[in-house]
Every structure is written in structure tokens, then in C-alpha cells.
Amino acid sequence: MERTSTSLLFLLSLLIIFASAVNQIRAQTCDENLSSCENCDQRCKAKHGPSSVSKCNGPDGTCGCASFKPAKLCIGATDMCTDKCPTSCCDRQCAIKYKNGKGGCVDYAGYRMCICEYTC
């Protein structure tokens, strides 16, 4: 029974780590060239929403449009928490592994896991 629990915990940890790695590579900013500067701001906002920012690049006369997506909170994991790696160590590991990562030890199925929250 304990072997099954350990295997299940290992697979769950791998799934969390994989999902968090996929979320890390998603961009939060979209920059697009909308050709000529004519009605630049209007076209930018129509295509990417009211919070988008437009800029006419003078020398080449092209309209640049940047849209920003709000930061999303994601959850990941690093390793098990132990006496040698308590909550402060877990928090440090999360900060190293994930951008703006913060972590803490959480009891799950009889194990103390280091769980991280980070913006993605």
C-alpha cells in the first residue's frame, strides 16, 4: 500500500511540475506590427482591447501595438520538505525555480511537499 502511495505522489509531483513548466513559457505581452500609422490607436484597441497601447514608429511609418494580459497565478512544486529543508528552504527553492515564486510546506497524503505559487 505504501509503495502505491509513493508512486501516486511521485506521479502527482511530476504532473504539477510539467504543468507549471508549460505555464511558464506563455507570454504575458503581445507586440504586433499593424502596418501603416493611419488610425493606429483605433485599430490597435479594436484588435487587442481597450488596455492595449499603440505607437506610431516615425521613420518607417508603422503602427506598433502592445497588449498586456493580466498575470495569472500558477502552482508548482519543487521537492519534499524535510528537517533539513523546512518552509524557509522551500520558499528559497521556489524563488529560484519560478519567476516571482513563493513557497511553503503542505501536508498531502502523509507527505510534506514544497508547493510554490508564482505568476505565469
Curated annotation (Swiss-Prot):
Disulfide bonds join 37-56, 40-63, 44-65, 74-120, 85-105, 90-114, 94-116. Residues 1-27 form the signal peptide. One of its GO terms (cellular component) is extracellular region. GO terms for biological process: defense response to fungus; killing of cells of another organism. Keywords: Antimicrobial, Disulfide bond, Fungicide, Plant defense, Secreted, Signal. It is found in: Secreted. It comes from the Eukaryota. InterPro entries: LCR. Belongs to the DEFL family. This is Putative defensin-like protein 179. The gene is LCR57.
